[in-house]
Amino acid sequence: MQLEVIKSFSLSIGTKIKIDQFGLLEGSLRNRKDGITYFGYNGINSNNNIDNIEEENNLDYLLPIKHCDNPGRFFKIQYIKKLNEYILKHLEKGFGTFIKIEDSMYLRNKSIINIGDVYLAIFFSEKNSDKKDIYGFNCDLKIKVYNNNNNNKEYTFEKENEKDIKIGRSNFGNDIELNDNLISKINCVIRYNNIKGWMIKDGSDTILKNGEIKRNFSKNGTWILASDNIKITDKMIFKSNFNIFKCSLIQGWNYIL
């Protein structure tokens, strides 16, 4: 597979990072070939000042950053042999590793959503005592909003099959209104489905006069924290510490995709 840098303050746009089932193909700092590629920051900033040293042999690929209070491994890409797929996972250092939501995605208890400068924390009610019910079946939804302009508000929604919970800018009739110019009129929609549980979708749908449905994507995206192992798909986009990457699954390498 390959990562391409499509936006960054520190890496050259168009930089391509190639990974196979053993790890980073070229220039690995760890050089372990264990199927895992660790991306992160070693604590030495662009001015060669030390923030907090993290040994380079813990990393495969170094992400240059001007300053970071918690250097170390930001995220990993790992090849899972028995599933013949790659996964992405945030490793709790840096400023978070977020996947861009292109289609509907499942929400899990304690999911973190980023839109504009706002963060939404997702929690399910405790009506169902089954701890394995991480997708919130038969549970109501609580959303906590974290942003300087929105005063950490909380919202609670009862499960109601196929009813849209609209999240977007203020004064546009949304269920959650956010005062942030980086956010679209309707930035994303959350919906409960009796079969799938709680789902989130970027943008909104408009029904045209001819009955067709037009998809309206948000301007700056809806992003979900990769707090669990997320299967990497072709053309998937994710961001980590002011870098945005596009994934490509390349046919014809020494493994089958």
Positions of the model-derived regions?
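Regulatory inter-domain linker segments that are low-complexity and enriched
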Residues: 1-15, 20-21, 27, 118-197, ...
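Forkhead-associated
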Residues: 21-109, 157-241
